[in-house]
Design a protein with these regions (language model features):
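Beta1/beta-strand and adjacent pyrophosphate-binding region of the FAD-binding site
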Residues: 6-20
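Conserved N-terminal/central alpha/beta ligand/cofactor-binding core
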Residues: 8-9, 26-130, 146, 158-175, ...
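Short hydrophobic core segments
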Residues: 15, 149-160
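An anion/pyrophosphate-binding glycine-rich loop and adjacent beta-alpha core
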Residues: 41-43, 59, 86, 188-326, ...
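Conserved beta-strand-loop-beta-strand element in the redox core of flavoprotein oxidoreductases
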Residues: 132-148
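A glycine-rich dinucleotide-binding beta-alpha-beta segment and adjacent secondary-structure elements
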Residues: 312-378, 406-419, 538-592, 597
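Internal hydrophobic alpha-helix adjacent to the cofactor/substrate pocket in enzyme cavities
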Residues: 384-405
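Extended, charge-enriched "interface" segments that sit outside catalytic cores
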Residues: 436, 442-444, 453-458, 462-614, ...
Length: 625
């Protein structure tokens, strides 16, 4: 034990500088709190230890929402992008999701600079070994492995996969963080001393291979969308450029046979790994064993950066022995001569049950202690980043004596994620999906600014310039919707030829432009030649106007559902409500309600094991008080 010494005084300490820690530290500092962020390695700030991309299905929604609130991730992705693709364009706008392939090293450098240049924020390379409290259970300081004692009033835990991290490659294992970095070996003991129960989760990553050893002619080339789409509402898409392609390939029966013959050497199947793995991101050995009927599995070969030949095998994560990895990779067309640069591995780490948190991500049992990211049981950079933002903002607001920052299920995917975590918990690493939201037509990525930028502006995290641009676009959208409702388009041979070409009924008399636009086959852009009086408005405003007119009926139905949900959310439950002393509640409901302690009737109704009858009783009991 090193001799402790006073090292400094801050309002908030953020432990970990991955995607959660970055957003937490930036938000807290921008709100005026003296903040310090600790990382085991400065070279790991904003590291992408798994796929070198930001966004994807549902994750793109989170990135846009974070940007609308004043977060940094979307700007960093735009500044370092190699390729931009909008996913799920064959489906409705509710599930359209942006994914940006990024330059891993440049992303790290962008985020490192963002932290270094942020007023009110100090950046420190050190391992935190304890969180210290006084006799009243109040946080007083954090202590480093070298004895530095930093006086703080609040702590945000954003430890990623570092807490007692342990990697596995076949029979080989060692205590390690991701990418061979030093793990956080001692902090877990300090958390247990605070009464926090920890559990083990695991995740994995594929090998990185040398691009010069790949036969790209045997793989399908995948280019970015033209023109590229920006992740941030503040980025001018005209400044973006697709730089590198990705590639698509497939495993085959030979690949699967090599894996099956060596499955006994897998630490997952051999029982060496105790942690629970991600359900929606299985390893290739998991895919082969669980989906034996499938003759092949798709993977993506993705560049790690502009100035490296290192490439990422998305969809082929593994913890099989190194020589087995080489053998099965080389059965794949295009990878017959492939050379591994980094070995695939699984990593096991400590995390918590997030039902121990409030919806501000503060621990119920330890005031001013917050959790964010994989520490809370989630997977994914984007899920981590939004939790970091929520924790950072709420830690700052609480210290300043201000009301908390809350966003609910009807307002955002961020609210859905937080509510799922603190209400339902997770038995395996939680991943955001559009299917997790009841209101996904309202929670589109294209309207994240309309939903959340007012909150970001009210917090002081959106600049006046961005706010005025937003207001202008919203005004343009509303004016264009009104114009389209009034403007009539007369039938012409050219218009009817277009309508027939897309499988829509030709016109026999004039119709309002909005009615024509409500036809599923007809787009706003395609109507431009038949709408000569159309004003020049921002493309984002035009997109919003089109979607809101085309799906007006569905949107009104979901808005009615939201009003009913809000009625329940606005019925608060006192924090000290004694469920066990109430008559009429079932024992299972009492146990669940006592443990999770929901903040409202709405949250209580979403707890597994609490029935509609229990909710009815609870409403009556609360009204009697």
């Amino acid at each position: 034990m090193m001799k402790p010494y006073p090292a400094g005084s801050y309002d908030i300490a953020v432990i970990g500088a991955g995607h959660a820690g970055i957003e937490a530290a930036l938000a807290a500092a921008r709100l005026g709190c003296r903040t310090i962020i600790f990382t085991i390695s400065l070279d790991a700030i904003g590291n992408m230890p798994c796929n070198p991309s930001i966004g994807g299905t549902a994750k793109g929604h989170l990135v846009r929402e974070l940007d609308a609130l004043g977060g940094e991730m979307a700007k960093a992705a735009d500044a370092t992008m190699l390729q931009s693709r909008m996913l799920n364009l064959g489906k409705g706008p509710a599930v359209h999701s942006l994914r940006l392939q990024c330059d891993r090293k440049r992303y790290h450098m962008y985020m490192k600079a963002a932290l270094e240049n942020q007023p009110n924020l100090s950046v420190r390379q050190a391992e935190i070994v304890s969180i210290d409290t006084n006799g009243a259970g109040e946080i007083t300081s954090v202590t480093t492995a070298m004895g530095g004692v930093y006086s703080v009033r609040a702590v945000i835990l954003a430890t990623g996969t570092f807490l007692k991290g342990k990697i596995f490659v076949g029979e080989y294992s060692e205590e390690s963080g991701p990418d061979g970095m030093h793990p956080a070996a001692h902090l877990s003991d300090s958390l247990r001393a605070l009464g926090i129960t920890l559990r083990r989760f695991k995740t994995g990553t594929p090998a990185r291979v040398h691009g010069n050893s790949v036969d790209f002619t045997r793989l399908e080339e995948q280019h970015g969308d033209e023109p590229p789409v920006a992740a941030s509402f503040a980025t001018d898409p005209a400044t973006l450029q697709n730089k590198l392609p990705c590639y698509i390939g497939y495993t085959n029966e030979n690949t699967h046979e090599v894996i099956r013959q060596n499955i006994g050497r897998s630490p997952l199947y051999g029982g060496a790994i105790e942690g629970i793995g991600p359900r929606y991101c299985p390893s290739i050995e998991d895919k082969v064993m669980r989906f034996a009927e499938k003759p092949r599995h798709q993977f993506f070969l993705e560049p790690m950066g502009e100035n490296t030949r290192e490439m990422y095998l998305s969809g082929l994560s593994s913890s099989l022995p190194e020589e087995v990895q080489t053998a099965f990779y080389r059965t794949i067309p295009g990878l017959e001569q492939v050379e591994l640069m980094r070995t695939a591995y699984a990593i096991e780490y400590d995390c918590i049950d997030p039902t121990n948190l409030k919806n501000t991500l503060e621990f119920k049992a330890v005031p001013h202690l917050y959790g964010a990211g994989q520490f809370n049981g989630t997977s994914g950079y984007e899920e981590a980043a939004v939790q970091g933002f929520v924790a950072g903002v709420n830690a700052a607001l609480k210290l300043q004596g201000k009301p908390p920052f809350l966003t609910d299920r009807s307002t955002s995917y961020i609210g859905t994620l937080v509510d799922d975590l603190v209400t339902k918990g997770c038995m395996d690493p939680y991943r955001m999906m559009t299917s997790r939201s009841e209101y996904r037509l309202l929670l589109r990525q294209d309207n994240a600014d309309a939903r959340l930028m007012p909150q970001g502006y009210a917090l002081g995290l959106i600049s006046e310039e961005r706010w005025q641009q937003f207001l202008t676009q919203q005004q343009q959208k509303e004016q264009e919707k009104k114009r389209l409702e009034k403007y009539s388009i007369a039938p012409t041979p050219a218009l009817n030829a277009y309508l027939e070409s897309v499988g829509s009924t030709p016109l026999t008399q004039p119709v309002r432009a909005a009615e024509l636009l409500r036809r599923p086959q007809v787009s706003y852009a395609a109507l431009a030649p038949f709408d000569p009086d159309r004003p020049a408005i921002h493309p984002h405003a035009a997109e919003q106007a089109e979607i809101e007119l085309k799906y007006e009926g569905y949107l009104k139905k979901q808005e009615a559902q939201v009003r009913e949900m809000r009625r329940l959310e606005e019925m608060p439950i006192p924090e000290d409500f004694d469920y066990a002393a109430q008559r009429g509640l079932r024992l299972e409901a009492i146990e669940k309600l006592q443990r999770i302690r929901p903040a409202s009737i709405g949250q209580a109704s979403r707890i597994s094991g609490v029935s509609p009858a229990d909710i009815s009783v609870l409403v009556i009991l609360l009204r009697q008080q």
